[in-house]
């Protein structure tokens, strides 16, 4: 019995690491690794993609990709074998979620139809004007307009619209080109108008608006005027 006890003790002293020194492996999540490797990169979310080892990084108005294994960032679009731009689809989905929460009370309201149409527009944008002609002929929508001026001239026209005593009529005049060709505009000194424009620009930045027109209709985003697709959606 003593001999057996001595043998066991010898084994414990000879191989202590196998019994007491079990190594603990720390697993670092992709999120933690990204924050450590790229501390200056702000983001809203990091989520896995359908590609193993590749994660989508959403900044709030842009999407790029991160590979934790190689600790690198990739810029560009993911395209499926069917030619579908996966990156664009994801971006539109995230944009739709944000547009659904827009404060419509700060927008210019036109019409009283049952279907809500939200638009970011520039009054000098050709396709914005084409869209206005399309929507102004319908009685089944309510249009909520957020302004996104792409030039000083557009900004002046927007202020003229918001300063007007008859906002709807002035908006109609602008969209029908009656104030084009550098037509003189009355001065607008209303500070509330300036604040409204700043609010619209801030909201556009948060959503990721880069061009006009941009529409939100029945949960879908259209980054351009697509009359056939919009017509079909409104009929559904």
Question: What is the meaning of each model-derived region?
Answer:
Residues 5, 19-159, 173-176, 184-212, ...:
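Extracytoplasmic thiol/disulfide redox context detector
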Residues 8-16:
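Bacterial N-terminal signal peptides
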Residues 1-8:
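Bacterial N-terminal signal peptides that target proteins for export
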Residues 160-164:
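Short, hinge-like loop/turn segments at secondary-structure boundaries
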Residues 165-172:
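Conserved, helical-rich catalytic subdomain that frames metal- and/or nucleotide-binding sites
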């Amino acid at each position: 019995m003593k001999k057996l006890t001595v043998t066991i003790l010898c084994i414990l002293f000879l191989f202590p690491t196998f019994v007491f020194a079990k190594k603990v492996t720390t697993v670092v999540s992709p999120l933690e690794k990204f924050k450590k490797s790229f501390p200056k990169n702000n983001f809203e979310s990091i989520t896995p993609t359908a590609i193993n080892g590749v994660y989508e990084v959403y900044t709030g108005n842009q999407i790029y990709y991160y590979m934790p294994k190689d600790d690198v960032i990739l810029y560009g679009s993911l395209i499926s074998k069917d030619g579908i731009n996966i990156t664009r689809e994801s971006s539109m989905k995230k944009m739709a979620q944000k547009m659904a929460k827009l404060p419509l009370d700060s927008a210019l309201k036109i019409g009283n139809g049952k279907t809500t149409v939200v638009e970011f527009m520039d009054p000098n944008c050709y396709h914005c004007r084409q869209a206005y002609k399309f929507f102004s002929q319908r009685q089944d929508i309510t249009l909520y307009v957020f302004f996104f001026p792409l030039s000083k001239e557009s900004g002046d026209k927007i202020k003229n619209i918001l300063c007007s005593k008859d906002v709807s009529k002035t908006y109609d005049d602008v969209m029908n080109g009656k104030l084009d060709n550098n037509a003189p505009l009355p001065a607008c000194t209303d500070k509330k108008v300036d604040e409204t424009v700043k609010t619209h620009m801030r909201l556009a930045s948060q959503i990721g608006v880069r061009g006009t027109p941009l529409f939100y209709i029945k949960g879908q985003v259209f980054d351009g005027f697509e009359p056939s697709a919009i017509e079909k959606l409104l009929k559904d």
